[in-house]
UniProtKB/Swiss-Prot annotation:
Region spans: Interaction with target base in tRNA: 115-117
The UniProt record lists the keyword tRNA-binding: yes
Protein name: tRNA-specific 2-thiouridylase MnmA
Entry-linked Pfam families: tRNA_Me_trans (PF03054), tRNA_Me_trans_C (PF20258), tRNA_Me_trans_M (PF20259)
Keywords: ATP-binding, Cytoplasm, Disulfide bond, Nucleotide-binding, RNA-binding, Transferase, tRNA processing, tRNA-binding
Gene designation: mnmA
Source lineage: Bacteria, Pseudomonadati, Pseudomonadota, Gammaproteobacteria, Pasteurellales
Protein's organism: Histophilus somni (strain 129Pt) (Haemophilus somnus)
Length: 383
């Protein structure tokens, strides 16, 4: 198969490089989406022996509108048939439940806001999948449709941001070690999303115009509140201002996150301005949601954070203060900061400028230029 867009936009490999690649087997994770579809095609063009693997990581239930595994599998199979490659199938639902979902529930129960996509990458895509591909399928590499890049210079493997800054997914992959990165290929990380779609359209792939998934990893885009209530009992309570004034009722602390503005159910409050309210604290002991009014309210701001559960890509803990940038949530602009090691698994991060909505349970991910250094889980804010 040929793609005019691919021929024009992507660098051509030499015949020697293609011959070298032809001795390597790559198992490409096929999600039924456009990114993994085009990744498999690019790997073929680069000469690799390519096979696909579809992972089922969530058991179907009665949420037929949200669990799209059957449709995704059909799309993945159609793409593999079109490309002429074999598609393997594996069920990691038990691993997902034990290593991702139970942690997800425990964090919400503890009043934190976890990022299950990060844990899914750590425990499923780059652990269970990688081990299965190498040990059972004889892979030399795995490949995924993530928008990140890998750098190999002087024997040093590094994880870099994706070329398309609008789609960069390095934030979700900071737990990977340099060895895991070295065993992984990220074909679409070197190109921009519009080109990925154009290649898919060129090839007539069924996934060319398929909408990107934006739901929780492997759970889909169901109504989150209803979904969470099936696993954790809600405990309604009071909404109070920072000064203690009661201004409403909340549905359960687990449904709210720091910095949240929408969905608080607070209308106009007598004697107060029309400025919006923001969540600034979740008081678990008293089951109180604390809010502040105005987007420039000092209660929203943090001077820094404490992060634990650290993962550095090179797996070498820092021993001295580090100047770098940090993201405390996906799609955030880089924040200039200083990282101060407290021990091998805990750092203090001091921002150059105060930041809003620093949320315990989310991840702080560190960068130097294009390189993703690693990160950790936000334990608490520093006010």
């Amino acid at each position: 198969m040929k793609s005019i867009v691919y021929e024009k936009k992507l660098p051509k490999l030499t015949s020697l490089e293609i011959a070298k690649n032809s001795k390597k087997k790559v198992i490409c994770g096929m999600s039924g989406g456009v990114d993994s579809s085009v990744s498999a095609f690019i790997l073929q063009q680069q000469g690799y022996q390519v096979e696909g693997l579809f992972m089922k990581n969530w058991e179907e239930d009665d949420d037929t509108d949200y669990c799209t595994a059957a449709n995704d599998l059909a799309d993945a199979q159609a793409v593999c048939d079109k490309l002429g490659i074999k598609l393997h199938k594996i069920n990691f639902a038990a691993e997902y439940w034990d290593n991702v979902f139970e942690h997800f529930l425990a964090e919400y129960k503890a009043g934190r806001t976890p990022n299950p996509d990060i844990l899914c990458n750590k425990e499923i895509k780059f652990k269970a999948f990688l081990e299965y591909a190498v040990e059972d399928l004889g892979a030399d590499y795995i490949a995924t449709g993530h928008y990140v890049r890998r750098s190999d210079v002087n024997g040093q493997t590094k994880l870099l941001r994706g070329l398309d800054s609008n789609k960069d997914q390095s934030y979700f992959l900071y737990t990977l070690s340099k060895d895991q990165v070295a065993q992984s290929l990220f074909p679409v990380g070197e190109i921009e999303k519009p080109i990925v779609r154009a290649i898919a359209e060129d090839l007539g792939l069924i996934t060319a115009k398929k909408k990107d998934s934006t739901g929780i990893c492997f759970i889909g885009e169901r109504k989150f509140k209803e979904f969470l209530a099936r696993f954790l009992p809600a405990q309604p309570g009071e909404i109070r201002m920072v000064d203690g004034k009661v201004i409403g009722k909340h549905d359960g602390l687990m449904y709210y996150t720091l910095g949240q503005r929408k969905g608080l159910g607070i209308g106009g409050v007598k004697g107060l301005s029309e400025d919006p309210f923001y969540v600034v604290e979740k008081d678990l002991i008293n089951n109180v949601l604390v809010v502040a009014q105005g987007n420039d309210n000092s209660a929203l701001l943090s001077q820094g954070l404490i992060a634990t559960q650290l993962y550095w890509v090179d797996r070498l803990p820092i021993r001295q203060n580090l100047r770098c940038t940090v993201k405390t949530r996906y799609r955030q602009q880089d924040i200039a900061c200083e990282v101060i090691p407290l021990n091998d698994d805990c750092v203090e991060v001091r921002f150059d400028e105060p930041q809003i909505a620093v949320t315990p349970g989310q991840s702080a991910v560190f960068y130097q230029g294009e390189e993703c250094l690693g990160g950790g889980v936000i334990e608490r804010q520093i006010k």
